């Protein structure tokens, strides 16, 4: 049996689509993702492309446009959907999840899910680099 002990993605091209909405959370997730790509995957900075879109609902369309080009080995989607007092959370989180999965299947390109779906700002902060780790970093590791 051959055991792989590391990831060498020096020639990999990775796209990161990130939502602008809730940027105070998303920027920490982005930092975690880039750190993991460069330190653990040896991905060169010039091989990482960051594309910003308005919010999490728009992430699937941005990912689809990138996947359609066929220039990237993987796509990482980053965002934060925080529950409020209306059903808006359920619609945005559900459609974002389904849309990103559809892109991965349709274009046979890995799409790592780094979108937080949380009940509070506190939970988002915990998952963006504090006591619950950094889900952006975890998404990048999944992409690798």
UniProtKB/Swiss-Prot annotation:
Protein name stated in the entry: 6,7-dimethyl-8-ribityllumazine synthase
EC number: 2.5.1.78
Gene Ontology biological process: riboflavin biosynthetic process
Catalysed reactions listed for this entry: (2S)-2-hydroxy-3-oxobutyl phosphate + 5-amino-6-(D-ribitylamino)uracil = 6,7-dimethyl-8-(1-D-ribityl)lumazine + phosphate + 2 H2O + H(+)
Transferase keyword on record: yes
Segment forming the signal sequence: none
Enzyme class (EC, first level): transferase
General function of this protein: Catalyzes the formation of 6,7-dimethyl-8-ribityllumazine by condensation of 5-amino-6-(D-ribitylamino)uracil with 3,4-dihydroxy-2-butanone 4-phosphate. This is the penultimate step in the biosynthesis of riboflavin.
